[in-house]
Every structure is written in C-alpha cells, then in structure tokens.
Amino acid sequence: MRFSAAKRAGCLFALILPAIVCRPWRLDAIDNIKIAYPSTSFTTMPILAASKFGLYQQEGMRLELILMRPNISVTAVVTGQVEFATAHGSIVRAAAQGMPVKSLMVVADRPAYYLVAKAGVNTVGALRGRSVGIASLGGSVHLMTKEFMAQNNLDADKNVALVVTGDHNTSIQAIQNGHVDAAVISVPWQTVAEKAGLRKLAYFGDVMRLPMAGLGASDENIAKKPDLLRRAVRATLRGIDFLRDAKNKKEVVGIMVEWFKIHGEQAQEAYGQMVEAYPPNGVVADEVLEKDLEIARQTGAIKNRVTLSRVVDFQFVKAARNELSVKKP
C-alpha cells in the first residue's frame, strides 16, 4: 500500500509522539551549552554522568565540556564564551570581588583529596621544611591545602614550600622523580599513588567540609536566561542522584575507568569515598559557605566581607530538588 507524503509524515509522527510524551523533561528546542571544568577530577563526574545518560538532552540541551583554568573560566562565563563553570571557589571569590557571577549549586561539598608522600615521610609534621605539590596556585585546592597545613601547625607560607606540579599523574611523577616530597591529589588517584609506593598521610575529607565544585553562571544569564539555567541545574542534580544511587554502581565505575583512565579495581576501591562528596540537594549550609569565604579572607584571596546572596543563588537548585522529589514514584 502506498502513502502520500502527508500520510507518511502523519504515521511517523504518531509513532514518535508517545516516546516524546513519556519523557517529562524533553523540550522541542535544543540549546547548545558549554561548561568549563578545571581538571580531570571527581568534581566533574555528576556532569559526565548526566551527559552520558542523556539527562541534558532530555532537558533540551546539547553539552560541550571545555577544559579551562579556573580564573580563565570565570572570565569566560562573564564574557559569554561559556554558559557555566564548575570552579565554585573561583566563581565565589570573583563574585566577592565584584565580578557579575554567582554559584548556582554545589556539586561536591567534601574535599575528596589525599595528601600523599614519598617513603620516609610518615606524618604531616614531617613535611616541615619540605615541598608539597599542588595543581595550581590561587584555586580552591591551594587554599584548602593552606588551611589543612594550619590545622597541623604548619604555615604554608613559611614552613612548607607549595609547588605547582599540575594534574594528579604529573604530581605523582614529581614525587617519584624527587622534585617534591609530597603532593595533594584527588580521589581516585590515591589508589594509583599507593601502587607506586607512595604513602597516604591524610584524607582532607575527614577533617574539613568545603564546597569544591559547583555550577557558576553570569548575573546576566541569571536575569535573562532563567529557564536555561533551571534546566541545566536540574540535569546536573539528576547526575548527582544517579551517582549516589547504589543501583548504578556498575555504570558509575565504568565512567570512572573511562574518565580517569584507571583500572576497574581501582575505581571500585575509590567509589565509596567519591560518591560521599556529592551533596544530595546540591547545596551546603550557610556556615560551610561562610567558612569557605573566611579561609579566602585569611589567605588574602579576598579582602572584604560580603553577604552570601552576593556570591550564590540557589533558587534554581532548590526548585529543581522540589520538582524531582515530586516526580519520584
């Protein structure tokens, strides 16, 4: 039987329509969005999961992830080169200094970082007069490391030399090659460090609670594109839900193996600590945000006290959590 073009189109539409109706978040238009991230870290995993399993697509978005240094990503958000940046600390500090940006949600609220050292360095105190590698200067990991050293009676500006050693692989290599005595690396790289013969001195997540990553946007987009921001935040929050659901462990471990380029057993070992770092509601308590700002003031990253409303805007993530809670069976 032959059909006219109009009838064929009608039949095709009838087949497609039920699939569209069954997807509650699916929109007609597709928006291209860019998210800047600073490194191959656990902090990007919620976004990766949301992208891999089509959660942004279901929200009517096509995602492009762009590797970018934190300070540059803030500028890129302001100028509109990217819609979002995950460097929560850099976004918040920039906002505190008057730049037109805000953090919309917190993706990781626990510093899932290890301090690892070469053989013979058995305590944090033994780092006095020695060197410690970090990814970069001025970012959240830098400030977190200075705060951790202070908690252990070490002045990071006087008693310890903080040296930029780059990402986790190059930091481990820097210890092995004798360029530094220790380094700060994130989960799951402590498993790689241990296999390389390095010693774990401390896990920062045991002694401090700080927002390590989020989703930052410009004040202009908050005012002019609230629907886009709401959908992006909702997809990212669904990514957190996916990671935290133990039923998805196999899929999450698979993403870890692919993203971090590690073995399956290493991903399995690091899985538990990693998922603990993701706040289920995408927000943190005010006192945690205040502590983050206080550390930034103490280390000279910002000078003046500011209200939290100047640096964060959690309206979108709170609305998204309410919507998702209602949608649950």
Model-derived features with residue positions:
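Conserved C-terminal helix/tail region of periplasmic/extracytoplasmic solute-binding proteins
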Residues: 293-329
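Short linear loop/turn motifs
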Residues: 64, 71-72, 161-163, 269-275, ...
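Secondary-structure end/capping motifs
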Residues: 223-303
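Pocket-lining segment of extracytoplasmic ligand-binding domains
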Residues: 89-90, 169-259
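Short, glycine-/small- and polar/acidic-enriched structural segments
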Residues: 30-167, 171-177, 181-187, 200-209
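Bacterial N-terminal signal peptides
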Residues: 10-22
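Bacterial N-terminal signal peptides that target proteins for export
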Residues: 1-13
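Sec/Tat signal peptide C-region and signal peptidase I cleavage site
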Residues: 23-29
